[in-house]
């Protein structure tokens, strides 16, 4: 993913540097390779060029997750669409798999194909359906995804290309760039729902400031 660019961060090291570190993967090495956003979020940047991704193997993915689990409350992995061996390892190590889909016929087809693959590796029960770029008037409905996949939508994110582009170009997260926008509220609701499921007794306001921070 491009989280570092979206957050206006300039990483000096990436996940490739961590994977190639001869001292192995430790919390010290992981921390030194991460960038820290003003919100407290730690970001491990993706490879600086596509060809470098070949240095990331399944054992690196597992080691990074295993180390990070002991130090971070929440770990978010932006795995993309290709189900490579390192990605499958990440999915197998995850508590939840958020399947993000735009509301169109191609996404509907891909969602079913993805679900079939996840079923083959016994990961289908982790899937939570996220509907992205939702608009009220559309030939493809949220219910089409729900009926085809046999699961309810976990979260629905409204379409607002103008606000998203402005947020990206400014290097600010949506929820701080334009917190009153419907799309920002949708994302906050999604995050708070996840937090409340994990830690039920805590309020959204209490946890919002520490989402993604170290323990």
Model regions and ranges:
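NTP-binding/hydrolysis catalytic cores, primarily Walker-type P-loop NTPases
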Residues: 169-215
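Conserved Switch II/interswitch segment of TRAFAC-class P-loop GTPases
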Residues: 94-112, 136-138
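Beta-strand-loop-alpha "switch" segments that mediate conformational coupling across diverse proteins
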Residues: 133, 146-173, 187
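Phosphate-binding loop that captures ATP/GTP phosphates
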Residues: 1-43
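Conserved C-terminal guanine-recognition region of P-loop GTPase G domains, centered on the G4
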Residues: 110-123
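Phosphate-binding/switch loop-helix module in NTP-utilizing enzymes
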Residues: 46-87
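G-domain G4 guanine-recognition motif of GTPases
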Residues: 102-103, 127-138, 156-162, 179
């Amino acid at each position: 993913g491009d989280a570092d660019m979206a957050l206006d961060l300039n990483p000096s090291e990436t996940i490739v540097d961590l994977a190639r570190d001869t001292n192995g993967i430790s919390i010290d090495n992981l921390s030194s390779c991460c960038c820290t956003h003003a919100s407290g979020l730690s970001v491990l940047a993706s490879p600086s060029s596509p060809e470098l991704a070949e240095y990331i193997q399944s054992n690196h993915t597992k080691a990074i997750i295993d180390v990070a689990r002991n130090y971070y409350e929440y770990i978010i992995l932006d795995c993309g669409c290709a189900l490579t061996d390192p990605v499958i390892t990440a999915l197998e190590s995850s508590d939840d798999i958020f399947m993000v889909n735009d509301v169109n016929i191609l996404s509907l087809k891909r969602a079913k194909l993805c679900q079939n693959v996840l079923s083959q590796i016994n990961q289908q029960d982790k899937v939570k359906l996220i509907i992205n770029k939702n608009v009220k008037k559309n030939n493809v409905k949220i219910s089409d995804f729900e009926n085809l996949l046999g699961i309810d939508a976990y979260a629905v994110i409204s379409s607002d290309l103008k606000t998203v582009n402005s947020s990206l170009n400014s290097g600010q997260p949506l929820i701080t760039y334009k917190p009153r926008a419907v799309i920002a509220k949708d994302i906050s609701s999604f995050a708070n729902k996840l937090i409340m499921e994990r830690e039920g007794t805590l309020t959204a306001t209490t946890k919002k400031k520490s989402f993604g921070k170290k323990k």
